[in-house]
Amino acid sequence: MVGLSAATLQGAPVVTQDIDLWFENLGDPKFRSALKEIGGFFVPPFGANPPQIGGEGLDLFDVVVHLHGLEPFRKEYCRSKKIRVGNVILHVLPLDRIVKSKRALGRKKDEAVLPVLLDACRAISGGKKRRRAKLLRELGR
């Protein structure tokens, strides 16, 4: 998962209308099988239209095949955060990588949300530093 939906799962106070899912290989039989299992289907790209997922209740999912400013899928996947949502573990693009991609893309709508994402990065980073310092104090270091 990438984009603002991924940022929200990491604590960023943002809203979005869709869930962006980044796929390495849309031709993978597992991708098609998973879609079929949930009653969905794949709509390949045509002209200026990007690839899409179709099916009842699936219109809020957007297919992403490339993220500007980032490493290839496999490298970014290795950096992903695992976040539990209900009974499912999701691989989520880390907040700092979302920021990097939005900066590289440079769309007005991305630039508008960057200050909020950067504040969230600082808050999350600061929280980790405080927890680490507290743990070190408790250990007497």
Predicted regions and their residues:
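Compositionally biased terminal segments of proteins
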Residues: 1-141
